[in-house]
């Protein structure tokens, strides 16, 4: 978990690269926004994607539980253009390691209870704003004025109310100030050790 622009995706990528190939399934929380196909487009466009009510928590928890029990799942996909779920799904096979990535990955208790290791990526507000501006102006073509208004009116208040408080549930807090190689190595060692112990228990 961690605020928008905190560097979650980078941290996840580094963890995946540090672990054995094909041992990790990454589940993006963004795929589990509510299906709003029953609503008109003008209503869907008003969706606050940074509020907990935007997510179908029960489906996310159900699919994580199924992956943990060795079952494959059909992960939903979401379109920010139509602001609703797409008919296509992504087939996800169970893996030794399952990573849930998202701003509120630690928000829902049912989901937290399925996690063996909870990580929060901590980055200062100014740095997060700069990263969001850089990402959304370059990659998504959003006007700067719109991004600043969105940060002030949506991102910051939602972060302060719903995202930042979930830090209390984290087992590890990573200050994302650049090189976090030692933290990644620590997590790699912990995760691989945990997987080994779980496999030993299953063999008994």
Placement of each model-derived feature along the sequence:
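P-loop (Walker A) phosphate-binding loop of NTP-binding proteins
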Residues: 2-3
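Conserved lysine of the Walker
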Residues: 8
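Hydrophobic positions on the alpha1 helix immediately C-terminal to the Walker A/P-loop
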Residues: 11
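Post-Walker A helix-loop "phosphate-sensing" segment adjacent to the P-loop in P-loop NTPases
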Residues: 16-25
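Conserved nucleotide-sensing/catalytic segment adjacent to the nucleotide-binding pocket
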Residues: 25-28, 34-82, 97
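Phosphate-binding/switch loop-helix module in NTP-utilizing enzymes
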Residues: 63-100, 105-106, 192-199
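ATP-dependent NMP and nucleoside kinases share a basic, alpha-helical "lid"
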Residues: 86-140
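NTP-dependent small-molecule kinase module
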Residues: 93-94, 134-138, 156-204
């Amino acid at each position: 978990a961690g605020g928008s622009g905190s560097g979650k995706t980078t941290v996840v990528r580094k963890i995946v690269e540090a672990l054995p190939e094909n041992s990790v399934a990454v589940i993006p929380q963004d795929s589990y926004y509510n299906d709003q196909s029953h609503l008109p487009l003008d209503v869907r466009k008003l969706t606050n994607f940074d509020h907990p009510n935007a997510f179908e928590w029960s489906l996310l928890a159900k699919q994580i539980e199924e992956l943990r029990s060795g079952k494959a799942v059909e992960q939903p996909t979401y379109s920010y253009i139509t602001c609703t779920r797409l008919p296509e799904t992504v087939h996800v096979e169970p893996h030794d390691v399952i990573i849930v990535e998202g701003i509120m990955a630690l928000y829902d208790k049912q989901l937290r209870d399925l996690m063996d290791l909870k990580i929060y990526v901590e980055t200062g507000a100014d740095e997060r704003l700069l990263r969001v501006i850089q990402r959304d102006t370059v990659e998504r073509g959003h006007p700067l004025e719109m991004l600043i208004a969105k940060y002030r009116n949506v991102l910051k208040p939602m972060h302060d109310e719903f995202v930042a408080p979930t830090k209390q549930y984290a087992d590890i807090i990573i200050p994302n100030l650049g090189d976090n190689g030692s933290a990644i190595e620590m997590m790699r060692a912990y995760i691989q050790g945990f997987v080994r112990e779980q496999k030993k228990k299953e063999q008994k």
